[in-house]
């Protein structure tokens, strides 16, 4: 029998393979802090929803994404074929959501023995092959209580309203030193109580207002404003593009609406990441907190199982650490 190694994405998976880790390495890949992650009766139904969101039709086709997700989950269905399962994950939101999903799935499959967790306080994919395995000294066995807690957090994330998730953000469950902060960071992507902006959107406007006007350096600046950076370039540029292409833009100057194919073409990519951005008058007012983004633009996005629209607009009050539902 062999070992199964699950980690966040391709960079970490490739590095662990290069380091010679003993086992079959599988990247999880899903960007769970983006798009719908609703309650579903089966894992297959959730895969179908996620494939529909993750596919862009050019760089990633839906059938390919669905096949990759199914192949990934098949390793958990066949967990009895592995005498040992290791989970190698990081401290940020991207990883912590993947971690609670995997543990919830393992618990549902009654895998309660020989599951081990490594939670790195930094980024696995940015290490070197000759030092990444040092994180194994952080390894410990997953307990029954951890499986239960992970399932509860995962279920809360998928609820159609965020109240349960906000309650979970008050809890620091044993064995998950980074989960509470990650869940709070997820809630900060809800529209703000007064300005209607997600934290990432607010950080973008703040940085442009202070002279970081090109998308490439802006991406680096916004990541540096995070306690634990979790956004990839596709995620960031999609949010940036939304601020430029909404009905009443907060930013101007972007060369085109972002889609993943932009980064596959050298000419388009260079023009996109070197564009000169500037706040519109509305952008300055929203940043100042005197105008609400949602009063001028449509809201249509997801946080886990919560579909945010102008009619169902859950907000997050960062000062009070609580939800606000107007």
What are these regions (language model features)?
Residues 57-108:
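Long, hydrophobic/aromatic-enriched structural stretches that serve as scaffold segments
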Residues 133-209:
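A conserved mid-domain beta-alpha-beta active-site/ligand-binding segment of alpha/beta enzyme cores
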Residues 117-139:
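Short, conserved secondary-structure transition motifs
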Residues 246-326:
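C-terminal engagement modules used by replication, chromatin/transcription, nuclear envelope/ESCRT
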Residues 1-67:
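A structured, charge-rich N-terminal accessory region that forms the first stable segment of a protein
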Residues 223-257:
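Charge-enriched amphipathic alpha-helical scaffolds
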Residues 212-223, 232:
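Short acidic, hydrophobic short linear motifs in intrinsically disordered regions
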Residues 14-18, 37-38, 95-103, 126-131:
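A short acidic (Asp/Glu
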């Amino acid at each position: 029998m062999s070992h199964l190694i699950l980690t966040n994405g391709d960079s970490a998976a490739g590095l662990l393979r290069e380091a010679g880790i003993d086992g079959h390495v599988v990247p999880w890949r899903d960007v769970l802090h983006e798009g719908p992650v609703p309650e579903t009766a089966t894992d297959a139904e959730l895969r179908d929803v996620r494939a529909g969101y993750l596919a862009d039709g050019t760089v990633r086709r839906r059938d390919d994404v669905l096949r990759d997700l199914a192949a990934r989950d098949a390793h958990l269905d066949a967990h009895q074929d592995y005498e040992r399962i290791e989970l190698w994950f990081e401290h940020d939101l991207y990883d912590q959501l993947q971690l609670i999903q995997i543990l919830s799935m393992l618990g549902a499959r009654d895998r309660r023995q020989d599951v081990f967790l490594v939670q790195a306080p930094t980024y696995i994919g940015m290490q070197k092959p000759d030092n990444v395995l040092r994180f194994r000294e952080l390894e410990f066995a997953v307990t029954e209580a951890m499986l239960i807690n992970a399932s509860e957090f995962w279920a809360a994330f998928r609820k159609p309203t965020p109240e349960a998730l906000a309650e979970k953000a008050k809890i620091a469950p044993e064995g998950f030193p980074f989960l509470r902060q990650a869940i709070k960071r997820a809630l900060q992507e809800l529209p703000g109580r007064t300005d209607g902006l997600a934290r990432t959107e607010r950080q973008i406007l703040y940085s442009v207002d202070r002279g970081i006007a090109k998308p490439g350096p802006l991406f680096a600046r916004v990541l540096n404003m995070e306690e634990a950076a979790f956004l990839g370039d596709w995620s960031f540029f999609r949010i940036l593009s939304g601020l430029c292409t909404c009905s009443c833009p907060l930013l101007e100057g972007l060369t085109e609406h972002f889609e993943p194919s932009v980064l596959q073409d050298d000419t388009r990519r260079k023009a996109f990441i070197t564009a000169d951005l500037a706040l519109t008058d509305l952008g300055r007012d929203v940043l100042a907190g005197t105008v609400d983004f949602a009063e001028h633009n449509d809201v249509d996005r997801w946080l886990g199982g919560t579909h945010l629209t102008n009619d169902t607009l859950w907000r997050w009050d960062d000062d009070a650490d609580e939800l606000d539902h107007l």
